[in-house]
């Protein structure tokens, strides 16, 4: 077997745990996109609360953006964790003992 060849019979496949991790990551990505679109849709319909000066309220524009940022960061962190698990369980070629 030549290293780097791309014959069909040499194609690597994932283990069942790796497939589960990959599908969990794909599902999370879909949910992430849906949740962000839903958040934008819902928050765009809520009127801003009048706030004067440097005080802030969660109903203000700054509060909406802060809530969106915190939600985005949390969901991105979970997505990064699931993505790293899917990456760790990827199929790898068997190591050859070429230099022994």
UniProtKB/Swiss-Prot annotation:
Disruption phenotype: No visible phenotype in rich, rich without NaCl or minimal medium. Double dedD-drpB deletion mutants grow 1000-fold less well at 42 degrees Celsius and are filamentous when grown on LB, no effect is seen in low ionic strength medium; few septa are observed. It is found in: Cell inner membrane. The chain crosses the membrane at residues 17-37, 65-85. Signal peptide: none annotated. Residues 38-64 are periplasmic. Keywords: Cell cycle, Cell division, Cell inner membrane, Cell membrane, Membrane, Transmembrane, Transmembrane helix. Induction: Constitutively expressed at low levels in mid log phase, in high (10 g/ml NaCl) and low (0 g/ml NaCl) ionic strength medium (at protein level). Residues 1-16, 86-100 are cytoplasmic. GO terms for biological process: FtsZ-dependent cytokinesis. GO terms for cellular component: cell division site; plasma membrane. It is a multi-pass membrane protein. It comes from the Bacteria. Belongs to the DrpB family. A non-essential division protein that localizes to the septal ring in low ionic strength medium. Localizes to the septal ring in about 30% of observed cells before cell constriction occurs; localization occurs in low ionic strength medium (0 NaCl) and requires FtsZ but not FtsEX. Overexpression partially restores correct FtsI localization to the division septum in an ftsEX deletion. Isolated as a multicopy suppressor of an ftsEX deletion mutant; it does not suppress other cell division defects (e.g. ftsA, ftsI, ftsQ or ftsZ). Bacterial adenylate cyclase hybrid (BACTH) studies show interaction of this protein with DamX, FtsI, FtsN, FtsQ, YmgF, DedD, FtsA and MalF, as well as weaker interactions with DedD, MalG and PBP2, but this assay often generates false positive results. This is Cell division protein DrpB. It comes from Escherichia coli (strain K12). The gene is drpB.
């Amino acid at each position: 077997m030549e290293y780097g060849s791309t014959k069909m019979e040499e194609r690597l496949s994932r283990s069942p745990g790796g497939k589960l991790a990959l599908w969990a990551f794909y599902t999370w990505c879909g949910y992430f996109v849906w949740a962000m679109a839903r958040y934008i849709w819902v928050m765009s319909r809520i009127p801003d609360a009048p706030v004067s000066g440097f005080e802030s309220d969660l109903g203000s524009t700054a509060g909406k953006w802060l809530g969106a940022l915190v939600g985005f960061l949390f969901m991105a962190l979970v997505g990064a964790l699931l993505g790293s698990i899917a990456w760790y369980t990827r199929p790898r070629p068997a190591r050859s003992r070429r230099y022994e």
